[in-house]
Amino acid sequence: MKAIQKVMGIIYAVSVMSLLIVSYASSAANVHETPTIKTIDRWVQEVSNWGRWGDADESGTLNLITPEKRVAAARLVTAGISVSLGHYAMTEKTVDNNSPYEHSMITLNLPGAENSRFDSIKVESHGSAHTHVDALCHQLKAGELYNGYSADVITDSGCAKLGIDNLKDGVFTRGILIDVPRLKGVPWLEPGVAIYPEDLEAWEKQASIRVGAGDVLLVRTGRWARRAAKGPWPMSERSS
């Protein structure tokens, strides 16, 4: 298998992956210190995209996926194989799945439509088990959402701004798989093991590829392989 698999098609970021913890390295021989709240606040300011695409923008860095980027991505297709990023529906309640997927079938016998079948599906998208995409209205910073939108746009009926409907046309771009366990020569990363910028850079070097603007990064941690071997993922403070 090639070191990098370019996944083409409708690509969604999969937040069910293990938390990607990115921290700057200290100057002391590859020693990483836990960042303080003050440091994180500084990073937020340094990488902020607020206002970059106008005060009314609701798409964030999806703006980097231009028509030209999509055309360039389409030209990379060779095998034409579709690869799903969705995880199977988990129906068992466990420590890493507090809200199991529920599916039920209903059979109705109506005149002229005997044995008609319908189904009902219930899924709580947020959590640590179900594949989902977090909208930009998911998190606030000091009472504000992305681009300075007020928290008032969020109500019990949904988000008037920054909702997931901004992705209604899908995400089509170049996908880059970064297989961190393979890089480190292990089957999976254990809970609490962080991924640092130098890990991503090492994968770029090993795979002879360079991440560019508008790319989607698919970072493999091996969480599901570990779960299959050792059971439910421990939802501790540093292993979400």
Model-derived segments and spans:
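Bacterial N-terminal signal peptides
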Residues: 11-23
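Accessible peptide chain termini
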Residues: 1-2, 47
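Active-/binding-site microenvironments in catalytic and ligand-binding cores
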Residues: 26-240
